[in-house]
Amino acid sequence: MEYRKFGDTYIVRMDRDEEILAQLKIFAEKEQVKLASVTALGAVKDFTIGVFDTSAKAYHSNRFQGVYEIVSLVGTINTKDGDFYCLLFTF
């Protein structure tokens, strides 16, 4: 992962086979980013997504094998009780 800061904006580039959530957490902790919006595009390989079932009030995960293009990924970086976490959504 590489990143650069331009004013109050960071541009982050992930390397192939890096896990998006793990790398964003490392970045946020290192730079002390406690609240941010995230937008991204690119490609992923072999990934898991979670779908929230509103009736059961539970997440179900789906695993995908292969290479897929990310046309739009949006989300946030947040903190809760001092811990960094991300919520990411793709369309």
Language model segments and positions:
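N-terminal intrinsically disordered, cationic/polar leader segments
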Residues: 1-91
